[in-house]
């Protein structure tokens, strides 16, 4: 798609493996996509979100939401990303949640980011958006490259204008992204 992407994970072993070309999951076509984009300098891996926040406008968060004891989604990883984001942003950035989360999660994410900014005594503008995945296991690469739909939920006009950028290749082919 021509974008520079930095993938962040707290698992150092996983990141070391990815930096050495070891893909921790099997998904048809994924190894080739990763290899090609690493070779072309567009794909990077790190354990530190802070390594990439200075030069980005959009951060996509795709973390696990395992079921909690009562069967609801456990949002601890989603909220930990929000905490790290709030502790480290320096300029306007949009945090986009890709994970499957319940209605109202964006408000919780915003509250966590605001708390972290208040602790820092900072007034950095930000937005939170939702962009759920519609990828089938075994067909994720194909589904990503040829989506039947892309849905993005935003609250601000600023985020609405910014978020089509990552989807520009789809928009060029008359693919509609509803906001």
Protein language model regions, located:
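Structural/interface elements that position substrates and couple domains in central-metabolism enzymes
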Residues: 1-179
């Amino acid at each position: 798609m021509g974008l520079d992407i930095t993938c962040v994970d707290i698992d150092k072993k996983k990141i070391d493996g990815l930096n050495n070309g070891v893909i921790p999951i099997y998904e048809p076509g994924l190894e080739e996509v990763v290899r090609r984009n690493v070779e072309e300098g567009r794909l990077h891996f790190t354990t530190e979100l802070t390594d990439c926040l200075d030069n980005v406008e959009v951060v996509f968060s795709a973390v696990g939401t395992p079921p909690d004891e009562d069967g609801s989604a456990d949002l601890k990883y989603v909220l930990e990303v929000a905490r790290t984001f709030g502790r480290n942003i320096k300029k306007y950035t949009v945090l986009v949640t890709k994970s499957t989360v319940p209605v109202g999660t964006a408000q919780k994410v915003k509250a966590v980011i605001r708390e972290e900014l208040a602790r820092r005594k900072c007034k950095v503008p930000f937005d939170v958006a939702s962009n759920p995945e519609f990828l089938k296991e075994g067909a994720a690469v194909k589904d990503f490259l040829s989506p039947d739909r892309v849905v993005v939920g935003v609250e601000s006009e600023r985020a609405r204008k910014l978020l089509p950028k990552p989807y520009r290749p789809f928009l060029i082919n008359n693919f509609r992204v509803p906001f």
